[in-house]
A protein has these predicted regions:
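N-terminal export signals
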Residues: 6-25
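Extended ligand-binding regions for polar small-molecule ligands
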Residues: 65-71, 143-146, 156-157, 162, ...
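Periplasmic-binding protein-like
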Residues: 43-44, 132-137, 217-255, 277-284
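Acidic, polar ligand-binding/catalytic clefts
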Residues: 78-151
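Short loop->beta-strand "edge-of-pocket" segments that line small-molecule binding or catalytic clefts
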Residues: 37-44, 58, 148-166
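Ligand-binding cleft/hinge of the Venus flytrap
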Residues: 66, 70-75, 79-81, 129, ...
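Extracytoplasmic small-molecule ligand-binding "clamshell" domains
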Residues: 28-106
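A ligand-binding cleft/hinge motif common to bilobed small-molecule-binding domains
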Residues: 108-121, 169-172, 196-197, 201-235
Length: 285
């Protein structure tokens, strides 16, 4: 059975022997145009951003990748990346080095945290083009008072993604009084679907997950909490993209495209197709 150490050793040996494909060198703009293809990395099973449906890869990030490729005059080769233990690992696997099991890095990766501290410790890449401001929201059904103090939800079924910020918040806050009421799901979108189906009384998930879930619910709706959750530490975060550090010509071109899409209303329209309200990233100015 291959160990992680064994896989690392194998990859290192391949590099030393020059056996890794030329594609591992991320393509700057001229090379992308010469090849006629841009390889764009998105996350696997990350609804509403990227997921498979009917054997086809769909989602907000998939549509955005296609739009960027079209505007560059090339074809989009959209590849799914399985999330690793950290976003730093994902940048290594998806952009500047490649995965240990043969995943070829992309020219461009979407859904990357746009954060100064995060960028500083990942100097192998350039983090660019902030295109959305994500945040968490709470939505409830089955008569749940969504504006109440969370302690009043004791005894109600609360849906969250396993090992997520919402999970840690509901289990650990208020002396753990809600811990036994939390139901775990593999993804935030599945937690939303459970609440939409009446299998949970409330869901704490990203606003994009909640809005897209409502969009596909055939007219069913949950009440969205308007007030802040007490002691909830996450104010939201910007989502951007990444290219390899030596591919800044490509990064500059992508930034011009996303800025134009935001100005023209095309970005807003792209999000509306999934029922998601486009919120510009704070860093976009």
């Amino acid at each position: 059975m291959l160990s992680r150490r064994g896989l690392i050793g194998g990859a290192g040996a391949a590099l030393a022997l020059g056996l890794m494909p030329d594609r591992l060198a991320a393509a700057p703009l001229a090379k992308v145009k010469a090849l006629g293809t841009i390889r764009v990395v998105v996350y696997q099973n990350n609804r509403p951003w990227s997921w498979e449906e009917g054997g086809k890869l769909v989602g907000l990030d998939v549509d955005l990748a296609q739009a960027i490729a079209t505007k560059l005059g090339v074809r989009a080769d959209v590849a799914q990346l399985v999330a690793d233990e950290s976003a730093d690992d994902d940048l290594r696997n998806g952009v500047w080095k490649g995965g240990l099991l043969g995943f070829t890095p992309g020219d461009l990766m979407l859904h990357v945290p746009f954060d100064r501290t995060f960028a500083a410790r990942n100097d192998q890449v350039a983090i660019i083009a902030p295109y959305y401001r994500e945040s968490f929201g709470l939505a409830g059904g089955n008569g749940l008072a969504v504006e109440a103090l969370p302690t009043e939800w004791k005894g109600r079924k609360l849906a969250v993604e396993l090992d997520s910020i919402p999970d840690f918040y509901l289990i650990g806050s208020f002396g753990g009084v809600l811990a036994k009421d939390v139901s775990h799901y593999p993804t935030g979108s599945e937690a939303v679907a459970a609440a939409m189906a009446g299998q949970a009384d409330a869901v704490l998930a990203s606003r994009a997950q909640i809005e897209e879930g409502a969009h596909r619910s055939d007219g069913k709706a949950l009440a969205l909490r308007k007030g802040p959750l007490p002691a909830f530490a996450s104010p939201g975060w910007d989502i951007g993209m990444a290219v390899k550090e030596n591919s800044r010509t490509l990064g500059d071109a992508v930034e011009e495209i996303t800025t134009a899409m935001a100005t023209s209303g095309e970005m807003k329209a792209l999000f509306e197709r999934y029922g998601v309200t486009w919120t510009p990233a704070n860093a976009a100015g």
